[in-house]
């Protein structure tokens, strides 16, 4: 796995909306972003690893869908999350 349970719990605590919240879009997007950032350097070294690239694209698409959902339901939370994660320029 990309990161340990301790690292995962730190991310959850940072982005949770209420104590024990692990399912909110903010937490899910933050965890996916962490996994994406962990996997991305692998593809600089291994340009032809298409099998793993497919998994990375799956994660990116899942994050995009969650961000689209958040943008459509609560635009202010979306903008705050984008700013905190540094996803858009």
From Swiss-Prot:
This is Small ribosomal subunit protein uS15. Pfam families: Ribosomal_S15 (PF00312). One of its GO terms (biological process) is translation. GO terms for cellular component: cytosolic small ribosomal subunit. PANTHER family: RIBOSOMAL PROTEIN S15, BACTERIAL AND ORGANELLAR, SMALL RIBOSOMAL SUBUNIT PROTEIN US15M. Keywords: Ribonucleoprotein, Ribosomal protein, RNA-binding, rRNA-binding. SUPFAM superfamilies: S15/NS1 RNA-binding domain. It comes from the Bacteria. HAMAP family: Ribosomal_uS15_B. One of the primary rRNA binding proteins, it binds directly to 16S rRNA where it helps nucleate assembly of the platform of the 30S subunit by binding and bridging several RNA helices of the 16S rRNA. Forms an intersubunit bridge (bridge B4) with the 23S rRNA of the 50S subunit in the ribosome. Part of the 30S ribosomal subunit. Forms a bridge to the 50S subunit in the 70S ribosome, contacting the 23S rRNA. One of its GO terms (molecular function) is rRNA binding. Belongs to the universal ribosomal protein uS15 family. InterPro entries: Ribosomal_uS15 (IPR000589), Ribosomal_uS15_bac-type (IPR005290), uS15_NS1_RNA-bd_sf (IPR009068).
